[in-house]
UniProtKB/Swiss-Prot annotation:
First and last residue of the signal peptide: 1-20
Keyword Transport: no
GO molecular function, one term: alpha-amylase activity
Note describing how the cofactor binds: Binds 1 Ca(2+) ion per subunit.
Disulfide bonds, paired cysteine numbers: 48-104, 157-171, 376-382, 418-441, 448-460
Domain of life: Eukaryota
E.C. numbers: 3.2.1.1
The protein's name: Alpha-amylase-related protein
Modified residues (Pyrrolidone carboxylic acid): 21
Gene3D superfamilies assigned: Glycosidases, Golgi alpha-mannosidase II
Keywords: Calcium, Carbohydrate metabolism, Chloride, Disulfide bond, Glycosidase, Hydrolase, Metal-binding, Pyrrolidone carboxylic acid, Secreted, Signal
Length: 494
């Protein structure tokens, strides 16, 4: 009986920890993360204070923070080839990182770090030098900056069969030296690295290449981490938020269900299907059952996005900034729908798979510059600064904890729905106008469409909609309008 009680206690404790790791630790009613891909720490700190906090964003996913290999031309993916756990990259050093985390936390913006636990750098001719000046010999699996030696890695092998669990989890992903997370020593170094970031005030981690590590090894690592730092405004006993990169199209040998109890899981099918719909390959009317009805993970387990830094560079259904009208519609739907834990992308312009972030002649990352409307102009795309996107972050905050209701569609590519009695969204992806009286579910009054403009000094700078005492309003979205979406909410009432 004593053994049974102890086993039950340990089981419940483990379940409690894993449940806590699904909590993003947002501040107030904020509930949207933005990925400021390849931004410098000093620029993120300023963005938190001057843009993200005033517009209601909840958190920032940052690029990998630890020292990486220096690759010719400085492609973005060099950040995913670590050679030590020193906090020095092209985004800045440890002091600048710590300052950024503190300043962002001070204004209610949480920081989530993209962490590389699966591997170290791939092969390099001779001695490699990292962004902190550390030397390593990746071909010999020698990383003195940690230190790691060959005994800390799985034996070298290539992934040739993606249906072979051993290859997926113990061979080298695109040639990257595969760490043995079952080793007590490797586990200790990874835990030490993550705990240091927790001490500096981060709220959680995106775990890169999680499916290439055994779930039981990750469970041990996550369970060994410190609680979040209360000096940065986190409650006592708060656990780091974990979201794990697991690419699972529904027929994978290593499945998302192995990881979704440990933390949230990236729902890549969400990205593909929302792209299909707004590219016109699937009628929007089918989005009425969006979420688990499409075979996605449960909402609290699903980390969702229209695109990410990887798949935005692929050919296929995934939308990116290069299709701006469809991208804004898809993002508006994403932010208006209650499904999933949401991240929006903030990119830099690219022409190919290897394009580096905007940099100067000395290969230093440059700071974003802005025009009079606040949009980025010097190689940074900054989708999060597009009015149609940041306004929907405000919409999402306004409708938090309400249900989707009042669905309407025209049997094709015109849809609308309510979020309780606090918000309304309409989308027109047809080649003809949407002009109709629709139920907005809102209290009577005049509302600004936050897509086409803003509420400033009691007046709308864009479209407005008058809602009658029955909640109905006349909705018009022309087929040739600049934006194919209209959004109203109670905080934009005139």
């Amino acid at each position: 009986m004593i053994k049974f009680a102890l086993a039950l206690t340990l089981c419940l404790a483990g379940a409690s920890l894993s449940l806590a790791q699904h909590n993003p630790q947002w501040w107030g009613n904020r509930n949207t993360i933005v990925h400021l891909f390849e931004w410098k720490w000093s620029d993120i700190a300023e963005e938190c204070e001057t843009f993200l906090a005033p517009r209601g964003f909840a958190g920032v996913q940052v690029s990998p923070v630890n020292e990486n290999i220096i690759s010719a031309g400085r492609p973005w993916w060099e950040r995913y080839q670590p050679i030590s756990y020193k906090l020095t990259t092209r985004s800045g050093n440890e002091e600048e990182f710590a300052d950024m985390v503190r300043r962002c936390n001070d204004v209610g913006i949480r920081i989530y770090v993209d962490v590389l636990l699966n591997h170290m750098s791939g092969d390099f001719d001779g001695v490699a030098v990292g962004t902190a000046g550390t030397e390593a010999e990746p071909s010999k699996k020698s990383f003195p900056g940690v230190p790691y030696t060959a005994q800390d890695f799985h034996p070298s092998c290539e992934i040739t069969d993606w249906n072979n669990r051993f290859q997926v989890q113990e061979c080298e992903l695109v040639g990257l030296k595969d760490l043995n997370q079952h080793s007590d020593y490797v586990r200790s170094k990874l835990i030490e690295f993550l705990d240091h970031l927790i001490e500096l005030g981060v709220a959680g981690f995106r775990v890169d290449a999680a499916k290439h590590m055994a779930a039981e090894d990750l469970e041990y690592i996550y369970g060994s981490l410190s609680n979040l730092n209360i000096e940065h405004g986190f409650p006592h006993n708060a656990r780091p938020f974990i979201f794990q990169e697991v690419i699972d199209h529904g027929h994978e040998t290593v499945s998302r269900e192995e990881y979704n109890q440990l933390g949230a899981v990236t729902e890549f099918r969400f990205s593909e299907e929302i792209g299909n719909a707004f590219r016109g390959n699937n009628a929007l009317k089918w989005l009425q059952s969006w979420g688990t009805g499409w075979g996605f993970l449960s909402s609290e387990q699903a980390f969702t996005f229209v695109d990410n830094h990887d798949n935005q560079r692929d050919q296929g259904s995934v939308l990116n900034y290069k299709s701006p009208r469809q991208y804004k519609m898809a993002t508006a739907f994403h932010l208006a729908n209650p499904y999933g834990i949401i991240r929006v992308m903030s990119s830099f312009a690219f022409d190919d798979q290897d394009t580096p972030p905007p940099q100067d002649a000395q290969e230093n990352i440059i700071s974003p510059e802005f025009d009079e409307d606040g949009a980025c102009v010097n190689g940074w795309i900054c989708e999060h600064r597009w009015r149609q996107i940041y306004a929907m972050v405000g919409f999402k905050n306004a409708v938090r904890d309400t249900e989707l209701s009042g669905w309407w569609d025209n049997g094709d590519n015109q849809i609308s729905f309510c979020r309780g009695n606090k918000g309304f969204l309409a989308v027109n992806n047809n080649q003809y106008d949407l002009s109709q009286e629709l139920n907005t579910c809102l209290p009577a009054g005049e509302y600004c469409d936050v897509i086409s403009g803003s509420l400033i000094d009691g007046a709308c700078t864009g479209k407005s909609v008058t809602v009658n005492e029955h909640g109905y309003g006349y909705i018009h979205i022309g087929s040739d309008d600049f934006d194919g979406v209209l959004a109203l909410h109670v905080n934009a009432k005139v």
